[in-house]
Amino acid sequence: MSHMAYTPKKQVRTRNTHAAFPTLPIDEIVQCLPGLDCMVTEEELLRPTSKFVQSMYAQIATSLLGINRESMAPALAACAAGTEHPETQEDARMLFALQKPLYDLFVASGVTDYNISDILKPSPERLRVQLSAIINYARFREIREKWYEKMSEELNEEEEARTMRLKNQEEKLRRKVELIALIGDTPDQDLVEQHRINDSRKSELKRLHDQNLQLNDERERNKAELRVVVNRLRHKHQLMESLQEEVARLNSYVVDNPKNLQEEVVELSKRVKERETVRRMLGERVQKLDLSVDSFKDFQVDVSSCLSAFQKLSDEQEAHSKAVRKITTQKELLEHVGINSRQAEGRRDVLQQEIEAAESKIARIQQDMSESDRQTSRRMEELRRQIGTLDAERALVVQQNNTAQKRLAELENDMATERDRYEAQLKMAREEAEKLQTQFREYFVEVGRRLN
């Protein structure tokens, strides 16, 4: 690959003692890197490893330059053609392919001594300087753009002023030449020299004008690219903030202790079984309540029959009352007429006995009706209390059943969501493990090759 020429193995590192940017503290670097889609810790920056620096710089190249493994797949495939076991050298080829874009990015950021040893053998000091350069470049590129526009405007104004001065001088010289031609004198040596200087200045002005046009075109292109990069960085920063909270929440399940995942699944299964048991018990209780309601309906029919019987007793009591009134009327008639015959006396005695029997019967009926009224009232009051209790209990059971069913559905949805999420996390962890194994194999191959 052509870009390997500028990273020799024995290249000496040079320190940029007069950097055009401030070196940021570690904590500020950790806060700024999520804007470049890089999630790091202070411990990783203070003790960097080759693998960590390579993955971080690859992510920075993807965020700022739009370079990733997919965009470089054709070139990497062409390099891997004809080699044995190309998959073992895939990361190494990707590492070398990123050197030229990273070198250009660091040079644009103000770091001119970047080389591949900064990835293979990283040091905390140089890593801090390089990350400070990239962060300052990404943070203050708009300020540099304004400074560039200001300098371009000043250059344009200066160029216009010089053009006007040269045009005025040219006009004066042209008039002087015409005057000399009119008087027929030979132009002196100064005039010839002045023409030569004017020609050189014209060529210089033309060159500056072309250069200014090129700078303006480049500025317009850079402005559009910078706007796209800024919008993409803002969007990615928002996504990283939301993902950072999600990763922190899932970290205890996937990274710290994978057994927590299995325990959580077992706990969810137990809770689902408990909810199933509660729902079954509630169903049985609802069935019992339905039976109680049916019994109460039967009792209502019995009460209706009792009320009909009470109505009949009332009608009979009214008939007896009419008979009593009739007997009383007859008694009064007998008293007024004064019948003295035995038949009248006997009839009176019979009527008196009938009256007494009717009165006793009426009294007994009234007593029975009073007792029946009291018993019916007590029974009705007791039934009303039972109905209220049954209605309240049934409403409570129905509410508990609905709540249990809703909670069970939520638990099933949460369990399905958590299961999918855990499976995705486990899949990512397996892929990361496979990638680490591949890198270890490459590393051992590289170490073996160097030892040989």
UniProtKB/Swiss-Prot annotation:
Keyword set includes Cell membrane: no
Coiled-coil residue spans: 152-280, 339-447
Cellular compartment(s): Nucleus; Chromosome, Centromere, Kinetochore
KW Nucleus (keyword) present: yes
Record GO biological process: attachment of mitotic spindle microtubules to kinetochore; cell division; kinetochore organization; meiotic chromosome segregation; mitotic spindle organization
Name of one Pfam family that matches: Nuf2
GO molecular function list: microtubule binding; protein-containing complex binding
Primary residence: nucleus
A cellular component term, taken from the record's GO annotations: nucleus
Keywords assigned by UniProt, alphabetized: Cell cycle, Cell division, Centromere, Chromosome, Coiled coil, Kinetochore, Mitosis, Nucleus
Signal peptide: none
Family per record: Belongs to the NUF2 family.
Quaternary organization: Component of the NDC80 complex, which consists of NDC80, NUF2, SPC24 and SPC25.
Role description: Acts as a component of the essential kinetochore-associated NDC80 complex, which is required for chromosome segregation and spindle checkpoint activity.
Name the record gives this protein: Probable kinetochore protein NUF2
